[in-house]
Swiss-Prot record:
Entry keyword set: Amino-acid biosynthesis, Histidine biosynthesis, Metal-binding, NAD, Oxidoreductase, Zinc
Catalytic machinery residues: E323, H324
Residues at which Zn(2+) binds: Q256, H259, D357, H416
Function of the protein: Catalyzes the sequential NAD-dependent oxidations of L-histidinol to L-histidinaldehyde and then to L-histidine.
Enzyme class: oxidoreductase
InterPro entries in the cross-refs: Ald_DH/histidinol_DH, Histidinol_DH_CS, Histidinol_DH_monofunct, Hstdl_DH
Reactions the enzyme catalyzes: L-histidinol + 2 NAD(+) + H2O = L-histidine + 2 NADH + 3 H(+)
A single cellular component GO annotation: cytosol
GO biological process: L-histidine biosynthetic process
Any Pfam family: Histidinol_dh
Record protein name field: Histidinol dehydrogenase
Residues involved in substrate binding: S234, Q256, H259, H324, D357, E411, H416
Family classification: Belongs to the histidinol dehydrogenase family.
Origin species: Vibrio vulnificus (strain CMCP6)
Length: 431
């Protein structure tokens, strides 16, 4: 880990060290994904079978996973695993249930009533990556809010063979359909539909560069589907003072670094002693990790920043806008009102990032790459949409009419003006 003293850097150097690595999909990925999307749109299920065999080296018997297969997968899980998944489900459901919006109804002036109501997005698609380890936690983070929001149809795609844990959580979340499809072809299938795969309105979930690019392409096509948020490498920033536990900090940094070689890991502290202790602790703990080689690559570009105060540490964090922000200080909650840009914040010694990743109740689908300045963590609102309503009485319209007419005249929109005056004239004619 590289250590720098913030005050010794010029403004240009400060900008440079906090710059994320460029996300370069490359023309080859863009073209390859466009080809996959076109093939799925043209050939439907046949393309899905062909591409699954090509990319995943698996020949599924069917696109859709059967109820029997889901039940058999559930039966294979240990009681311990089921209990863990059910506890996580309960906590996530409790937190997301609390996010249910309250309808708004306001009389802005006599006879003019404005309302706001929320409706679920009708059909949503969840993408769960494959790979060496299953990700049932991601199914929970996507499936629970979709269920609570009341989405009419929820489907899930994952590369075959789909892990038992994923199928069990799909059952917990009452997901309607599960498909043996991964990669860009899964995104295309959900965005445009095939004989077996339901076309959805919005697609959620992480994935590799091909999945990310497929999501981008379908979201830019009005015939495609909306997506949850832009994606980038995972990241953590830790703010720590001299009271922090260096071993805890090292463990938190490494838990992020093991995600992938492009993970971003940053410690900001006014304590040189803590910086040195964390450097030593990281090296000791690194040797014990099964994914040490991956974590080591991420650490090669990681940073320890020596700030001159906690106030400056907060400013650095707000400027960087991390996906995960851990605050290990004497009074972490005192800093909370000053923290503006973060996907999820973990306060105090006993709040490791892992808790939020799996089971505390918050959502682990978070904006990265500095998007925390404008994007929020995934929540119930992402599976819903707002509608406004207005209802005017006859007297309400008459009272509001002069304002609307004056503004319509200023904008040169005669038909807008006439839509009001024609009504007022009829009201006046009635006497």
């Amino acid at each position: 880990m590289r250590t720098v003293v913030w005050q010794s850097l010029s403004e240009t150097q400060q900008d440079a060290i906090l710059e994320r690595p460029a996300i370069t999909e490359g023309a080859n990925i863009t073209a390859a994904v466009a080809e996959v999307i076109a093939k799925v749109r043209a050939e439907g299920d046949a393309a899905l079978f062909e591409l699954t065999e090509k990319f995943d080296r698996v020949k599924p018997e069917s696109i859709r996973v059967t109820e029997q297969e889901i039940e058999e997968a559930s039966a294979r899980l240990t009681a311990k695993m089921k209990q863990a998944l059910e506890q996580a489900y309960a906590n996530i459901a409790k937190f997301h249930n609390a996010q249910k919006p309250t309808p708004i109804k306001v009389e802005t002036q006599p006879g003019v009533v404005c309302e706001q109501v929320t409706r679920p997005i009708q059909k949503v698609g969840l993408y769960i990556p494959g790979g060496s380890a299953p990700l049932p936690s991601t199914v929970l983070m996507l499936g629970v809010p979709a269920q609570i929001a009341g989405c009419r149809k929820v489907v899930l795609c994952s590369p075959p063979p789909i892990a038992d844990e994923i199928l069990y959580v799909a059952k917990l979340c009452n997901i309607d359909e599960v498909y043996n499809v991964g990669g860009g072809q899964a995104v295309a299938a959900m965005a445009y539909g095939t004989e077996s795969v339901t076309k959805v309105d919005k697609i959620f979930g992480p994935g590799n560069a091909y999945v990310t690019e497929a999501k981008r392409q379908v979201s830019n096509d009005f015939r495609g589907a909306a997506i949850d948020m832009p994606a980038g490498p995972s990241e953590v920033l830790v703010i720590a003072d001299e009271t922090a536990d260096a071993d805890f900090i090292a463990a938190d940094l490494l838990s992020q670094a093991e995600h992938g070689p492009d993970s971003q890991v940053v410690l900001v502290t006014p304590s040189v002693l803590i910086a040195d202790q964390v450097t030593d602790a990281v090296q000791k703990q690194l040797k014990q990790l099964s994914r040490a080689s991956i974590a080591e690559k991420a650490l090669a570009s990681s940073l320890i920043i020596i700030a001159d105060s906690l106030t400056q540490a907060v400013s650095i964090s707000n400027y960087y806008g991390p996906e995960h922000l851990i605050v290990q200080t004497k009074n972490p909650r005192e800093l909370l009102p000053l923290l503006d840009n973060a996907g999820s914040i973990f306060l105090g010694d006993w709040s490791p990032e892992s808790a939020g990743d799996y089971a505390s109740g918050t959502n682990h689908v978070l904006p990265t790459y500095g998007y925390t300045r404008t994007y929020s963590s995934l929540g119930l609102a992402d599976f819903s949409k707002r509608m406004t309503i207005q209802e005017l009485s006859a007297e309400g319209l008459k009272t509001l009419a002069p304002t609307v007419v004056t503004m319509a005249e200023a904008e040169g929109l005669d038909a807008h003006k006439r839509a009001v005056t024609i009504r007022v004239e009829k009201l006046n004619a009635r006497g």
